[in-house]
């Protein structure tokens, strides 16, 4: 009797993946669950989730302002949702761990959703005279990549491509262009709008929209959020502070130090 061949090893460690998922902070978990819920809702044929919640310039009005917040949660098909979830999870988890759960909620339900949407509507409707609807969490992916690129630029201004030095802050722009070229039905304008807001976030211009820590501590203490909510990240638990440069690299003393060419991004679309 022939001995069955051993199965090839998995490309990932299931135990480590499970451990990582169990350690995800609260807001990140909620975002992932809402994205999954909207994808499941889109499977039925009675009501179109995409038509209801997409960012459609001509549909924005007093009674449909909710679209400014719903479009990042909605996706077109399983592949769109799956790839965006893979790319968004580490970025959003890192942001929440650094800044706290309440700050993440205030920013992502507020300016980090509405500001990219505002830029997109302004250009798409009033300059391009078009009405292309967009959906997808890649708006947050490119926004967070833009913010991280600014932080990286402060400590490592350039990466080397052969003998050419390229500013590290441009890496999301290259990713945006490549995604638009190689991935069909993507929104270059939507991704670019997100990168612009990400740059502003990384430069600290959106600090005014962050609630003061005194107020956040009062809310946390009054509602006992840390004791009541599992995986909640309090103001005093955040890792590196709100706007500090992450200690992933150290700039060379007395000169600029190029970094190797590397990039963490997504190849998924923001669009129908």
From Swiss-Prot:
Glycans are attached at residue 185. It is an enzyme of class 3 (hydrolase). The active site is at 138 (nucleophile), 191. The chain crosses the membrane at residues 30-50, 72-92, 103-123, 133-153, 164-184, 186-206. It is found in: Membrane. SUPFAM superfamilies: Rhomboid-like. One of its GO terms (biological process) is proteolysis. It catalyses: Cleaves type-1 transmembrane domains using a catalytic dyad composed of serine and histidine that are contributed by different transmembrane domains. One of its GO terms (molecular function) is serine-type endopeptidase activity. The keyword Membrane applies. Signal peptide: none annotated. Its main location: membrane. Its EC number is 3.4.21.105. The keyword Glycoprotein applies. It is a multi-pass membrane protein. PANTHER family: RHOMBOID PROTEIN 2, RHOMBOID-RELATED PROTEIN. Belongs to the peptidase S54 family. This is Rhomboid-type serine protease B. It comes from Aspergillus fumigatus (strain CBS 144.89 / FGSC A1163 / CEA10).
